[in-house]
């Protein structure tokens, strides 16, 4: 009984976080692609994971939900959880504590966003990625 109540509470919290509380009784097949993406995140969060692997977690999500997601990710991290984010969105990557910029399977740089920007000598992470990637052929500058 207590376990079931806890599970229901976690499900409710996860659905609220991803903005799907009003769709709690819906069949997955009736949800849009974006809603399904958010539901996948909710399913992962219900289990209170110690390690959360996220691939483009906020692409296509409105700014209000995006802020809520990142607040939740930070809270999970403060409780000892580890979050690994794969993203092509540099603004999103810059929210992470540590980054590894990778191009074509090659690590270009590892560090905080500030460290990587300083190393590249540019003010933003996207410019740092482009500078460190070097030529269009993908050779990094030395």
Q: Where do the model's predicted regions map?
A:
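Conserved ABC ATPase "signature" region
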Residues: 3-23
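ABC ATPase "signature
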Residues: 110-111
């Amino acid at each position: 009984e207590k376990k079931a109540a806890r599970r229901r509470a976690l499900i409710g919290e996860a659905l609220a976080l991803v903005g799907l509380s009003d769709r709690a009784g819906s069949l997955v097949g009736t949800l849009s692609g974006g809603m399904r993406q958010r539901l996948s995140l909710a399913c992962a969060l219900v289990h209170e994971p110690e390690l959360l692997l996220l691939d483009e977690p906020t692409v296509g999500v409105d700014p209000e939900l995006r802020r809520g997601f990142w607040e939740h990710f930070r809270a999970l991290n403060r409780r000892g959880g580890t979050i690994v984010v794969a993203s092509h969105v540099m603004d999103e990557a810059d929210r992470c504590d540590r980054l590894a910029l990778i191009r074509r399977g090659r690590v270009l740089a590892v560090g905080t966003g500030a460290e990587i920007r300083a190393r590249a000598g540019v003010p933003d992470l996207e410019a740092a990625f482009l500078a460190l990637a070097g030529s269009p052929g993908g050779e990094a500058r030395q």
